[in-house]
């Protein structure tokens, strides 16, 4: 059971994400408009992958079988007062990964993950979507969500990618000769911020734990998940992957990136 310790965590100045403060809530009523805090935490994780096989080298162990389902569950306990930790919190997260073979139609990879922050915590300890702020493709991240755009204390995410293995492109002689491969990806995020962690509610005006959200942070509508769709080509020169990503909703905000192009270099044999 590893223990991690953050010596100091800087928190930027706290402001509302909306122009008007809610009734009963003023900046003076909230502690820590600009603050530093420490966290001390213990983390334990269990992983179960029946049928998974490996090759062992002197430096590391490499997976050679990606067909086995992988189940993980972990819990993080923040300890107040231990090594200077300022907050007590409990965060639980679980995930499932599975690959499905579609015969001549290639393969589908599915990754489902969810988590809950059980305690009232300042916003840096809330759940932030795993975002990719670069132009390099990163697995199991959202490509068009900005950093800290959505803050939740419970979430579920789904990543699905379907590699057609040339089933469509092989019908086009030039693409068949080039051995390019097509794929489609879908990403979905459901999130909710419960009342106990919402600093915009008057009932939390006297909280000595909550902090105001920075500008640009938003509260998701639990009735409307976030969606992304991607269309890609890989195996270009057996090396280059290119994909077009489109954000399907939550587009009515200033500065939102509705679409983009991402790249990756990965050797394919």
Where do the protein language model's features map onto the residues?
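Exposed, low-structure sequence patches enriched in small/polar residues
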Residues: 1-269
